[in-house]
Design a protein with these regions (language model features):
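Non-catalytic DNA-binding core/recognition domains of DNA-processing enzymes
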Residues: 83, 105-106
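Short, basic interhelical loop/turn and adjoining N-cap
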Residues: 108-126
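Charged, often Cys/His-bearing segments associated with DNA-binding zinc-finger transcription factors
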Residues: 1-57, 451-475, 538-549
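Basic, short loop/linker segments at the boundary and entry of helix-turn-helix/winged-helix-like folds
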Residues: 43-86, 463, 467
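Anion-binding and metal-coordination hotspots
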Residues: 2, 97-100, 105, 119, ...
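N-terminal core-binding DNA-recognition domain of tyrosine recombinases/integrases
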Residues: 72, 95-97
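Alpha-helical support elements that line or immediately flank enzyme active sites
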Residues: 85-95
Length: 549
């Protein structure tokens, strides 16, 4: 049963099995249509983007990775996977739709040349080829929690970085908000929409099951009548009626419609937006608790979440980008995609956890949102130096950088003056150390004005932590010239989000986390190819930085 999800393609209610076969059309044959071009046409073709794509990108696509998506039985062979993946990248490069990509492959010789299909009697893409391939990838990821397309894009990025002689020893990181293509709904609109979708579904399945007083929800014009074409003073009464109708629907659907998506969204909406008090349903308030950013924003995209950042409201997703930098430019070598309430710090932790330990020291430059003692320690375990160009939170006194802690951070070994403490107790809950020194050590210490200990008759006490110590060290390093050069280098990654928004049309992203991530991966691959093409043609101008030397 599991194999049905990704081993079958359904067309006109007939199940079509497809077996995996590698693409044998890698070299130009004697009958290749390329031979029919004039010398002038061949020269123009070899100067175009298609030549770079055909020589560097297409051969680097690993078809075998995707063999698990197809049947191992003898059956009709699949469309060549490297042609499909190449087409998905070119589609984003020129902002084609699926249908436009299929049509242009038949008519544009540059596309055929780029995808090595000039020897094909018939171009291999049909109107459903790309969508079926995406569906196979989605189903495989759902079953096995492995994103084959993400791995493919990352491997292509690594190949491009190698061609551009970018070692990956210096990387920079930034995140970007991606808006879901949904309307901002008020709470009343959200409840109405969920009721309406369920009512339409019930009416379609069995018209007699929906009571007459609820049939108005199936009218496309009813939304405007209920929400907008009434006085604002009636809002409370309309809301009461909506909640009463919701309870009626809930009772009607308990036995028959629990397996439908519309019912699940309806129940989720009621559980998140309302509470039942003394037998009466009402809107949930802050005092009731349970109000959070994961609440459904619109049933058209139930995975989209809410986040407020830099004074702006966002509904949708967020992407995290890691860009490797070198003298010859930069390449996005990894990307992550999640709901927009996923923090930058979480992205970094997940990225480091899946990263293998680096053979050579690697630097990752980030902004303050990625900072933290745990992140720094995790990076160190992978032979990665985490450099944050700014810090969030409370300023740490500079003198704390000169305290010496044990490796676990549970004990202060020496103060800046070199004295060992008389006693030190670790407070597990706050992760701080309460440290006592002899009275005379602190009373006559030249650092007293900076440490500011509480001096008593026999002892002097100070409370500090290894986190504050590490923070003070970072603050001190930030004033160095090398650190300033790293900060200047990190600024470049902030051009990537604007580049993707401007040139790769994020507003056309499909709804849903899984589908959005797939399309975003194609955009990253297209962006990296453009960087490679500019490098090959000598079109890139890259500001040099001393840390790249």
């Amino acid at each position: 049963m599991l194999l049905l999800l990704y081993n079958r393609a359904i067309l006109e209610k007939k199940v079509i099995f497809m077996s995996f076969k590698e693409n044998s059309y890698q070299q130009i044959s004697f009958t290749d249509s390329f031979s029919g071009l004039t010398a002038r046409e061949q020269k123009a073709l070899e100067k175009s983007w298609a030549k770079v794509f055909a020589d560097e990108i297409f051969p680097a696509i690993d078809e075998k990775r995707f063999c698990v998506l197809y049947s191992n039985k003898a059956s009709r062979p699949n469309t060549p996977v490297n042609v499909i993946v190449g087409a998905l990248i070119i589609k984003e490069l020129f902002d084609y739709s699926d249908d436009e990509m299929v049509e242009n492959l038949m008519l544009d010789f540059r596309l055929q040349y780029a995808l090595h299909t000039t020897s094909f009697e018939e171009q291999p893409l049909s109107d459903k080829t790309l969508s079926r391939f995406r569906r196979r990838c989605y189903d495989y990821e759902t079953l096995h929690n492995k994103d084959l397309y993400h791995d493919c894009v990352n491997d292509l990025s690594a190949s491009i970085a190698k061609l551009m002689r970018i070692s990956g020893k210096i990387r920079r990181m930034d995140s970007m908000m991606i808006e879901s293509n949904i309307r901002k709904l008020s709470r009343m609109e959200l409840i109405y929409t969920c009721i309406s979708k369920l009512a339409v579904s019930m009416n379609k399945a069995n018209a007699s099951a929906l009571p007459e007083d609820l049939k108005h929800y199936t009218d496309p014009n009813d939304f405007n009548r209920v929400i907008y074409h009434q006085r604002s003073t009636d809002a409370e009464e309309r809301l009461k009626q909506l909640l009463a109708d919701a309870d009626k629907l809930l009772t009607l659907c308990e036995s028959e419609y629990q397996d439908s998506t519309e019912y699940d969204l309806f129940v989720r909406c009621l559980s998140e937006q309302t509470v039942v008090e003394n037998g009466t349903r009402r809107l949930r308030t802050k005092e009731d608790g349970g109000m959070n950013s994961s609440m459904m924003q619109n049933p058209s995209d139930p995975e989209a979440t809410f986040r407020s950042k830099a004074g702006k409201e966002h509904r949708g997703y967020t992407a995290n980008l890691e860009e490797s930098v070198g003298k010859n430019g930069s390449v996005v070598t990894d990307y992550q995609y999640d709901q927009n309430n996923h923090s930058d710090s979480q992205f970094l932790q997940e990225h480091l956890e899946q990263m293998e330990k680096q053979e050579e020291r690697t630097v990752i430059i980030t902004d303050g949102a990625y900072s933290g003692t745990e992140n720094t320690q995790l990076a160190s375990e992978k032979n990665v130096e985490l450099i944050t160009t700014s810090l969030t939170g409370k300023f740490a006194p500079d003198i704390l950088a000169d305290f010496e802690f044990n490796e676990e951070g549970t004990k202060v070994l020496r103060c800046p003056a070199g004295y060992a403490p008389k006693s030190c107790s670790y407070m597990k809950q706050s992760r701080q150390c309460a440290v006592s020194f002899l009275h005379e050590q602190c009373a006559n210490c030249p650092y007293q004005d900076q440490c500011k200990p509480k001096i008593f008759k026999r002892v002097a006490k100070i409370v500090t932590s290894k986190a504050a110590h590490e923070r003070a060290k970072i603050q001190r390093d930030m004033s160095s010239e090398e650190y300033k050069n790293y900060a200047r280098l990190r600024n470049g990654v902030e051009t990537v989000p604007s580049n993707i928004r401007r040139n790769y049309h994020l507003e056309k992203m499909p709804r849903g986390k899984q589908r959005g991530k797939f399309f975003f991966g194609s955009k990253i691959a297209a962006l990296n190819f453009r960087k490679l093409f500019n490098y090959v043609k000598g079109l890139g101008n890259y500001a040099q930085n001393p840390v790249l030397a």
